[in-house]
């Protein structure tokens, strides 16, 4: 790193996806196919400054992973995309999160409609206290009026996409609580995609799962990117390397480096990124 680079802030020294780097200034430019554009995003828990001037472009139809040590802000950043913070008056976001040119932070659009476009799956499997069938149908009924036959087709479609249909097709009337942890997480993914969102957010989706269930979820993530833009938060760097096309490394609320996953893991631009990936830090 030369002397001029050493005085740039972390975002200005960010590595952007191939073909998107402004060589003159070292700043990331928006990919032509960016699905979400984050501009000068700051986030606060009361007076605590949790995210600091984040600038990031999430490529469409790809899997983007957020990595970094606990408390670095990766889950906070993920949850700003569908305004989960709106539930808590002491939390606020400033800046822009653009999707199709619309700033999601200031839009007057009904928040439930926003979350229909940007689905989310949480760290711990959270099936609803109802049947497997109704877990899938519940969200669909909020946004669409389908006949019973159409709903049956949608339920089968979502469970098939989540690689769960063959395991539950004969017990759709049974409680989702009766499924294994891995099956419950796939049920939650099926529930998320049943309303046909454009973006799917996954917050540590495998942290509570065994290795076999984790492998199935990772295979599913690879398949889902053909239809969705996927953003995943993970503490597991091997998982990020296996599953994602792009990776963002965060530390203390700042975006340190962002780029193609292979380049981030093999030849990162920032020493901080290299130290974290190689286990010398974090």
Swiss-Prot record:
It is a peripheral membrane protein. It holds the Pfam family ABC_tran. Its EC number is 7.3.2.1. It is an enzyme of class 7 (translocase). GO terms for biological process: phosphate ion transmembrane transport. Residues 36-277 form the ABC transporter domain. Its main location: membrane. One of its GO terms (cellular component) is plasma membrane. It is found in: Cell inner membrane. InterPro entries: AAA+_ATPase (IPR003593), ABC_transporter-like_ATP-bd (IPR003439), ABC_transporter-like_CS (IPR017871), P-loop_NTPase (IPR027417), PstB-like (IPR005670). The keyword Glycoprotein does not apply. PROSITE patterns: ABC_TRANSPORTER_1, ABC_TRANSPORTER_2, PSTB. It catalyses: phosphate(out) + ATP + H2O = ADP + 2 phosphate(in) + H(+). Keywords: ATP-binding, Cell inner membrane, Cell membrane, Membrane, Nucleotide-binding, Phosphate transport, Translocase, Transport. Residues 1-26 are annotated as: Disordered. ATP binds at residues 68-75. Part of the ABC transporter complex PstSACB involved in phosphate import. Responsible for energy coupling to the transport system. Belongs to the ABC transporter superfamily. Phosphate importer (TC 3.A.1.7) family. This is Phosphate import ATP-binding protein PstB.
């Amino acid at each position: 790193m030369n002397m001029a680079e050493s005085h740039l802030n972390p975002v200005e020294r960010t590595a952007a996806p191939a073909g998107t780097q402004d060589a003159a200034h070292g700043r990331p430019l928006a990919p032509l196919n960016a699905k979400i554009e984050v501009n000068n995003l700051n986030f606060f828990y009361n007076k605590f400054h949790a995210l600091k001037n984040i600038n990031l472009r999430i490529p469409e139809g790809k899997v983007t992973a957020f990595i970094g040590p606990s408390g670095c802000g990766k889950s906070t950043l993920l949850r700003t995309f569908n305004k989960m913070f709106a539930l808590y008056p002491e939390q606020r976001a400033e800046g822009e999160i653009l999707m199709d040119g619309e700033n999601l932070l200031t839009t007057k659009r009904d928040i439930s409609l926003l979350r229909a476009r940007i689905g989310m799956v949480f760290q711990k499997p959270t099936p609803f206290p109802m049947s497997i069938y109704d877990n899938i149908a519940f969200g669909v009924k909020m946004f669409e009026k389908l006949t019973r036959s159409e709903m049956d087709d949608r339920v089968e479609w979502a469970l098939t996409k989540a690689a769960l249909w063959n395991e539950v097709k004969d017990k759709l009337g049974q409680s989702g609580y009766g499924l294994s942890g891995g099956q419950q997480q796939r049920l939650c993914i099926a529930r998320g995609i049943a309303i046909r969102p454009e973006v799917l957010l996954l917050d540590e989706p495998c942290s509570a799962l065994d290795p076999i269930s984790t492998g199935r979820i990772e295979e599913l993530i690879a398949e889902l990117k053909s239809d969705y833009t996927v953003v995943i938060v993970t503490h597991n760097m091997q998982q990020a390397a296996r599953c994602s096309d792009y990776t963002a490394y965060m530390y203390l609320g700042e975006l340190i480096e962002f780029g193609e996953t292979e380049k981030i893991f093999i030849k990162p631009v920032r020493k901080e990124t290299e130290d974290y990936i190689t286990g010398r830090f974090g």
